[in-house]
Structures are given as C-alpha cells and as structure tokens.
C-alpha cells in the first residue's frame, strides 16, 4: 500500500476546519500532519487536538518548528491574502507545495474542472484557488467559451452573511479583483467583472450565483450542452452544486449600449446568456447554507489530491534486496 501524503492546514477558522474534516473523512490519499492557527482558543485547534492532529498556535513559524514538519509535502493556506504572502515567503526555502485558498494570487489560478491538469506538471509550487464565487462561476464561463467567444462575463455571488467570517470580510476587494482576473484568465472571457453580496436573511439562504455572458451568434444547443456537462463535472466533487434554472438566451435589442462593457477589438454581441446556480454545502463542519465555503474546500481538496498523486508517482519504488 502506498503511504498517504502528509498535509498541513494554516488557518484554524471556518474554512481550515472544514477542510481538515474533509481530509480526515473523505481522502484516501491525504493525511493530516498539522493544524496551524494563531488563536490558542480557536475551535479549529481544539477539534484538531481531539482528533489527534498535531497543532500549533504559533502560526507558520510554529509549523516550521513541528517535529514532523519535514514529512509534510503539501500546505493549505486558509488565512487571508496578506497573511498568505508572509506564509509563502516563510515556507519558500522548504520546497513545500502550497494550495492557497486566499485571494493572494501568488501562483496560477486553478479551477479543477477547467485547468487543474495544466498546473500539475513543471515547477509550480503555489496554486491559487481563486475565490468561492470564482470556483462556482468560472466553470460556467469556461463552458460557454468552449463553444463561442465570450466578449464580457459578469458574475454575482450571493452568500449568507453568517457564512462570511472575518477573513472573507477582510478580503472583499481582493475577492472582486481576483475573481474578475480569473474570469478572464481561466474562464476565457475578454473582460470579466465580479460582484459579491452578503445576504443577511434569516434563516440563512444557500449560496446563489448568477453568470451573465455576452456573445455573438452561436449554437444555443451546444452552449446549453456544454454548461450542463460542466455542471456535472463540478458536482462530482461538490454534490450540492446545481443549475437552479434552465440556461436562458436573450437577444440584445438594437441600440442597447452594451459596447460600453466590451474591450476594444471584441464584438459585435447579439445575445446575453444567463446561468443561475445554487450551491448547497455538504455540512461536514459548516451548515449546509455555507456552500460558498464548501466549494472552496472541496476544490482545494481535489487539487491537493491530484498533486499528491503526482508526488506518489515520483517517489522511487523501494528496490528489493
């Protein structure tokens, strides 16, 4: 039997703790090597200790000082954009693979069903999981782009206010910037825009996402099939991910000033494609309404498992005497 790959999680908040539970319950290739935080009284560190996972409340330096640090191959960072930049610099001399769940964007953007395979080879040591809104919507933009050029794509991510912890709230600007860039770089849109809404409704509502894309004349059936197929691929690792309504195609009236949204050299556009999504969380640690956090941890887990398989394949087999 091949040994599991050891991982550490920096960030003992909502995302980090949910990710730990996923590794422990669901992964047949990853093993928890450490849970790292900065608050010794955090629930995440307490849960990790109860589950016999090594812990430290001294941040990244505490991780480096752990006895089993050398055995850890992959480090998840579920802190904040600013903290990740410091953590990445501290870990750089040690050759660890970093899976960044913050909007820091040091490494390339990864959305598993779209471009994960592109970043498993080579010398990529830091991959960025974009944002929750990006993980939910960029597959849809990419599905449309696979059929026809997308001149402009706009996404609106509506999440339950209760699911937004201090890290999420501190990174609202980074969320919009990172998601917008990834809509273009990964989704394939010529121009992207992202909006996040923290919904204070009680009881909390499930994550809802809207994707709007401006395209020229194209095969609507082919686009619909591409979107449906992509949704099924995301649902393989996020079972609560689903299309909430049928894909809608709306003709853009003559005189509509959509040219103001388009970058130079694109267009003309004749049709608006509307995709409506809902993401229900698996409720491993967080409530089901926190689909925004669940899709991030699920995407990060899938990415790390793919990295781990590559690591296993590069470990020389023991030579029998």
From Swiss-Prot:
Q: In which residues is NAD(+) bound?
A: 12-15, 163-171, 292
What EC number(s) is this enzyme filed under?
1.2.1.10
Q: Which GO terms describe its molecular function?
A: acetaldehyde dehydrogenase (acetylating) activity; NAD binding
Q: Name one GO biological process term.
A: catabolic process
UniProt keyword list: Aromatic hydrocarbons catabolism, NAD, Oxidoreductase
Source organism, top-level taxon: Bacteria
Keyword Nuclease: yes or no?
A: no
Active site per UniProt: 132 (acyl-thioester intermediate)
Q: Which SMART domains match?
A: Semialdhyde_dh
Instruction: Describe the reaction catalysed, as an equation.
Output: acetaldehyde + NAD(+) + CoA = acetyl-CoA + NADH + H(+)
Q: Which NCBIfam families match?
A: ac_ald_DH_ac (TIGR03215), PRK08300.1 (NF006157)
Instruction: Name the family the entry cites.
Output: Belongs to the acetaldehyde dehydrogenase family.
Record's protein name = Acetaldehyde dehydrogenase 1
Native source organism of the sequence: Rhodococcus opacus (strain B4)
């Amino acid at each position: 039997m091949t040994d599991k790959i050891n991982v550490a999680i920096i960030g003992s908040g909502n995302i980090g703790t949910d990710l730990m539970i996923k590794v422990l319950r669901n992964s047949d290739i990853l093993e928890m090597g450490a849970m790292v935080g900065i608050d010794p009284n955090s629930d995440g560190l307490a849960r990790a200790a109860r589950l016999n996972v090594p812990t430290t409340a001294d941040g990244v330096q505490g991780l480096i000082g752990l006895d089993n640090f050398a055995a850890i191959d992959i480090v998840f960072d579920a802190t904040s954009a600013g903290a990740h930049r410091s953590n990445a610099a501290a870990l750089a001399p040690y050759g660890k693979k970093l899976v960044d769940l913050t909007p820091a964007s040091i490494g390339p953007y990864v959305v598993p069903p779209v471009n994960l395979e592109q970043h498993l080879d080579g010398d990529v040591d830091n991959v960025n999981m974009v944002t929750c809104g990006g993980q939910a919507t960029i597959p849809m933009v990419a599905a449309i782009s696979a059929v026809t050029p997308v001149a402009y794509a706009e996404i609106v991510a509506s999440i339950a206010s209760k699911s937004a912890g201090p890290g999420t709230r501190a990174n609202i600007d980074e969320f919009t910037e990172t998601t917008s860039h990834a809509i273009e770089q990964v989704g394939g849109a010529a121009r992207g825009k992202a909006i996040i809404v923290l919904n204070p409704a009680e009881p909390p509502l499930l994550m809802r996402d809207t994707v709007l894309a401006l395209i020229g004349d194209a095969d609507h059936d082919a686009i619909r099939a591409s979107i449906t197929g992509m949704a099924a691929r995301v649902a393989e690792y996020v079972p609560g991910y689903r299309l909430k309504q049928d894909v809608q195609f709306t003709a853009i009236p003559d005189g509509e000033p959509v040219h103001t949204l388009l970058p130079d050299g694109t267009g003309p556009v004749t049709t608006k494609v509307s995709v409506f999504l809902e993401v229900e969380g698996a409720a491993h640690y967080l409530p089901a309404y926190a689909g925004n956090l669940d899709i991030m941890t699920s995407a990060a887990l899938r990415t790390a498992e793919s990295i781990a398989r590559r690591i296993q394949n590069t470990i020389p087999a023991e030579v029998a005497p």
